[in-house]
Each structure stands twice: as structure tokens, then as C-alpha cells.
Swiss-Prot record:
Binding site for Mg(2+): D242, E288, D315
Localization terms from the record: Cytoplasm; Secreted; Cell surface
Keywords from the named record: Cytoplasm, Glycolysis, Lyase, Magnesium, Metal-binding, Secreted
Name assigned to this protein: Enolase
Active-site residues, record numbering mapped to chain: E205 (proton donor), K340 (proton acceptor)
EC class: lyase
Any Gene Ontology CC annotation: extracellular region
Length: 431
């Protein structure tokens, strides 16, 4: 047993230059843990509350001093004295202390920072890597990376409607080789864009952010890059999209406006037709948030039409929330959940969502946020839970590469017992 003797939070910066919460946990044994909380740009309306100060004189109102103070003045006194290995008990105590259904009193960013730092301190105490401490002896599966190499929507200042266009190197024999394949395609894409006279600046998640004629054109240039790198689209490398359609859903009309393509007033059925057409023309294996988070009828139609052969990931749809996920499972909506620790606010609840998804035959994709830091906790979570997939950005920006590098270390440490399933991690669809 190692008792927590101090908890301390401070305001630091994320990859977009916005403040976020860093938490440190100290124990009587000398074990120590530190964690930094990520932040999203396109957020689901049902997410746990990220507490911002709203003081326009500091960081344009995005300061997090209130969340920091909540850790130092409210949460710390509550959990000092806990055994650092009592993760569930500590998380439960913070949830009860907050007392709201969405962590709106203390802030999910305050609670999550403590939850993650506690896990790091506990792993330090028992002398295990974080993934082994959280996942036990069976934690050995390296995730298939979903690499966002073209950014659009809320993640870039361009005219592309869809938020992310990803490559998935499912044909690699190991995680290390999947990273090499992804990096080679990324560099090939830069050359393709340059040769077309297009911008090669990168967006929030490290992908390129060119102005393109359509969302279809984004897929076309990625196919060209895959082939230029010497790989075969639909064999070695598949495509994925995070549409983030809530960002271009018009609540007043109940329609979808693809402004970048000059197509407005699209119905849910027309959006589903569009996705089905794209999936016939391109080797798309995963679509995230294809319809608005509250358009459950649209999601149901999409699942009925292509859910047997395409992974349909719920991000804003499920917000890492077991109640929302249970509703989706009951109604047969989507077949996968995106796991973002700050959408729900504790590691305990995060693990519960992954477990529920797997029991129902849904896949789980551990994910970063667009506002990231050097913290690589999600890499360990992906291996600890054998989630099978991770979405943590492109092959540039240290805030993204930090997660890939941590996974490379874990694979090296696991040695011969490391597993990389590639295409088999999409176990609930037919390819």
C-alpha cells in the first residue's frame, strides 16, 4: 500500500497554445505520477464539461485556473489518504464530490487530470509500465493506427468539409512496420500535393490542409500517394474518414450543408447515398460520425446500408458514455465507439465503455484530441485494453508522434509476445 500525500495541479499549454490542466500525484513511498489533459475542437454536446474560466483578459477566455483550483482546493483534500492503487475508489470519490451528471461543477479536465496522474503514480509504485499495470499480463495487442494525413473541417483553415481523411496500414506484419508504411505514404502525399501546386502546411493533427475541389478529391490524392509510396490501396493500406458531420449540420433546416462542395440542403438519406457511393469507389474501411450526433434515424439507416462492411464509429454520437453506447447497442446503431478519455472524465469510466463495446461486438478506437500535449497515456491505454485501434494523428507534430513513439517502445518491450492484428482488428465487418 502507498498512500497519496499530495496532489498538485498547474496550468500548462496544449498543442494549439491553449491552456490545459497538468496534475501531479505524490505518495508516501516516493512513487510519483504526472498527467496532462487533452482538449477537443469539435466537441459533442453530450460530453463531460471542460471547465474554462471565461475571463477574456486571459488566454481569450480559455484559461483553466478554476479547474486547477478545483484540483488543489477541492479534490486534493478528498483523495489525500487514499491508497494510490485504488483507482476505482478514487474516481468514484471525485464523481461523488462533483455531484453532477456531466462533471460540470469541478470540470472533467480537473477530474481526468487527477485520474490519469493517479494511475501513473500507482504504476510507478508497483514498478510496472502503465500499460501492464492497467491491463495485466494479457496486455499485448498493439493497435492498428488510423493516421489523419489530410485535415479539414474544424481542424484546418481550408475548404474541405470532412474533418479527417486517414490511412490505415492494415497489411503491416508489426506495429513498427505500420508506422513505416504510414510515414512513407505521408511523405509521398507531401510530394503529390507539392507537384499539384497545393499547400503542404499542416493542420491541428499534423495532416496536410490543402484547399481541394471536393471531399472526393481528398481521397483521390491519398490513393495517388499510397501508390507513389509503393503500396496498394485496399490491400496494404485502407482509407478512413472522420466526417464530423455535426459541424456542418444545419439545425434550423435539419439538413447537411457541404459548403466546400457547394452542395447544401442534403437530407440524411442523401448523405447515406453519398457515403455508399464513396465506399464503392474507394477502399474505405471506417467512417466516423457520418451523421449528426442527434440524427439517430440517419445513423440507423447508415448502419443498415453499409454497417456489415464498413466500421461505423460513434464519437459525438456516443461521447465515451456507457448510457449513450447502451442506447446505440439496443437500437443497432453503428458498430464501433471512439474512446476519448476527456469526453467522460475518468479512467474507470473509460475502461467501462471499452468493456461494454467489446461485449456487444463493437470495436473500440482509442483516440487523441485535436488539442494534445506530450502526454502519451492513451498509447498505454490502447495496449492495456487490447483495443485494437488507435487514432492519434499524422506523421508530424511531436504531440502526435509522442504516442507513436510510446507504442514503438511498448512493442519493443513486449518482444515476441507483441500482437499486431491489422485487418483482423476490424473483427465485426466483412472485408
Amino acid at each position: 500500500m502507498s498512500t497519496i500525500i499530495d496532489v498538485y495541479a498547474r496550468e500548462v499549454l496544449d498543442s494549439r497554445g491553449n491552456p490545459t490542466v497538468e496534475v501531479e500525484v505524490y505518495t508516501e513511498s516516493g512513487a510519483f505520477g504526472r498527467a496532462i489533459v487533452p482538449s477537443g475542437a469539435s466537441t459533442g454536446e453530450h460530453e463531460a464539461v471542460e471547465l474554462r474560466d471565461g475571463d477574456k483578459s486571459r488566454y481569450l477566455g480559455k484559461g483553466v485556473l478554476n479547474a486547477v483550483n478545483n484540483v488543489n482546493e477541492a479534490i486534493a483534500p478528498e483523495i489525500v489518504g487514499f491508497d494510490v492503487t485504488d483507482q476505482a475508489g478514487i474516481d468514484r470519490a471525485m464523481i461523488e464530490l462533483d455531484g453532477t451528471p456531466n462533471k460540470g461543477k469541478l470540470g472533467a479536465n480537473a477530474i481526468l487530470g487527477v485520474s490519469m496522474a493517479v494511475a501513473h503514480a500507482a504504476a510507478d509504485f508497483v514498478g510496472l509500465p502503465l500499460y501492464r499495470y492497467l491491463g495485466g499480463f494479457n496486455a499485448k495487442q498493439l493497435p492498428t493506427p488510423m493516421m489523419n494525413i489530410i485535415n479539414g473541417g474544424s481542424h484546418a483553415d481550408n475548404n474541405v468539409d470532412f474533418q479527417e481523411f486517414m490511412i490505415l496500414p492494415v497489411g503491416a506484419p508489426t506495429f513498427k512496420e505500420s508506422i513505416r508504411m504510414g510515414a512513407e505514404v505521408f511523405h509521398a502525399l507531401k510530394a503529390v500535393l507539392h507537384d499539384k501546386g497545393l499547400n503542404t502546411a499542416v493542420g491541428d493533427e499534423g495532416g496536410f490542409a490543402p484547399n481541394l475541389g471536393s471531399n472526393r478529391e481528398a481521397l483521390e490524392v491519398i490513393i495517388e500517394a499510397i501508390e507513389k509510396a509503393g503500396y496498394k490501396a485496399g490491400e496494404n493500406v485502407f482509407l478512413g474518414m472522420d466526417v464530423a458531420s455535426s459541424e456542418f449540420y444545419n439545425k434550423e433546416t435539419g439538413k447537411y450543408d457541404l459548403a466546400g462542395e457547394g452542395r447544401t440542403g442534403l437530407t440524411s438519406a442523401e448523405m447515406v447515398d453519398f457515403y455508399e457511393e464513396l465506399c464503392k469507389d474507394f477502399p474505405i474501411i471506417s467512417i466516423e460520425d457520418g451523421l449528426d450526433e442527434n440524427d439517430w434515424d440517419g445513423h440507423k439507416l447508415l448502419t443498415e446500408r453499409i454497417g456489415d462492411k464498413v466500421q461505423l464509429v460513434g464519437d459525438d454520437l456516443f461521447v465515451t458514455n456507457t448510457q449513450k453506447l447502451a442506447e446505440g447497442i439496443e437500437k443497432g446503431i453503428s458498430n464501433s465507439i471512439l474512446i476519448k478519455v476527456n469526453q467522460i472524465g475518468t479512467l474507470t469510466e473509460t475502461f467501462e465503455a471499452i468493456e461494454m463495446a467489446k461485449r456487444a461486438g463493437y470495436t473500440a478506437v482509442v483516440s487523441h484530441r485535436s488539442g494534445e500535449t506530450e502526454d502519451a497515456t492513451i498509447a498505454d491505454i490502447a495496449v492495456a485494453t487490447n483495443a485494437g485501434q488507435i487514432k492519434t494523428g499524422s506523421m508530424s507534430r511531436t504531440d502526435r508522434i509522442a504516442k507513436y513513439n510510446q507504442l514503438l517502445r511498448i512493442e519493443d518491450e513486449l518482444g515476441e509476445i507483441a500482437v499486431y492484428d491489422g485487418i483482423k482488428s476490424f473483427y465485426n465487418i466483412k472485408r
